[in-house]
């Protein structure tokens, strides 16, 4: 994923920053506890497509 694009994207729920997980092909929002999929290089920033992050994934 292009780092310039990542700097512009925000979580649609919290408007907070997103972190890219290359291995899982996801953008994560720690504040919303959601992970948005990236498919074929395109971030899918729909809450209905996101999965909830566990405490373990958040390092809590």
Curated annotation (Swiss-Prot):
Cellular compartments per GO CC: cytosol
Xref: SUPFAM superfamilies: Trm112p-like (SSF158997)
Database matches in InterPro entries: Trm112-like
Family of the protein in this entry: Belongs to the UPF0434 family.
Protein name, UniProt field: UPF0434 protein Rfer_3156
Organism: Albidiferax ferrireducens (strain ATCC BAA-621 / DSM 15236 / T118) (Rhodoferax ferrireducens)
């Amino acid at each position: 994923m292009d780092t310039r694009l990542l700097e512009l994207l925000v979580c649609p729920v919290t408007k907070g920053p997103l972190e890219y997980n290359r291995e899982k092909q996801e953008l994560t929002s720690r504040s919303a506890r959601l992970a948005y999929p990236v498919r074929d290089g395109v971030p899918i920033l729909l809450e209905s497509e996101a999965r909830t992050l566990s405490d373990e994934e958040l390092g809590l």
